[in-house]
Amino acid sequence: MEALVYTFLLVSTLGILFFAIFFREPPKVPTKGGKEN
């Protein structure tokens, strides 16, 4: 059971980090879906 909890925490942290980066990058580029969708 502990393994599941640790995995969930790891995935959650990674997800939050990715979301933070993904939402922080777009504002810098006014054009939507230019080089990367």
UniProtKB/Swiss-Prot annotation:
Cell compartments where the protein resides: Plastid, Chloroplast thylakoid membrane
Membrane topology: Single-pass membrane protein
One matching Pfam family: PsbT
UniProt entry tagged with the keyword Metal-binding: no
Keyword annotations of the record: Chloroplast, Membrane, Photosynthesis, Photosystem II, Plastid, Thylakoid, Transmembrane, Transmembrane helix
Residues in the signal sequence: none
The keyword Ribosomal protein is assigned to this record: no
Entry GO CC: chloroplast thylakoid membrane; photosystem II reaction center
Residues annotated as transmembrane: 3-23
GO biological-process terms attached to the record: photosynthesis
Family affiliation: Belongs to the PsbT family.
UniProt subunit comment: PSII is composed of 1 copy each of membrane proteins PsbA, PsbB, PsbC, PsbD, PsbE, PsbF, PsbH, PsbI, PsbJ, PsbK, PsbL, PsbM, PsbT, PsbY, PsbZ, Psb30/Ycf12, at least 3 peripheral proteins of the oxygen-evolving complex and a large number of cofactors. It forms dimeric complexes.
Functional note: Found at the monomer-monomer interface of the photosystem II (PS II) dimer, plays a role in assembly and dimerization of PSII. PSII is a light-driven water plastoquinone oxidoreductase, using light energy to abstract electrons from H(2)O, generating a proton gradient subsequently used for ATP formation.
HAMAP family assigned to the protein according to its UniProt record, in alphabetical order: PSII_PsbT
Protein name, entry field: Photosystem II reaction center protein T
Species of provenance: Ephedra sinica (Chinese ephedra)
Gene name as annotated: psbT
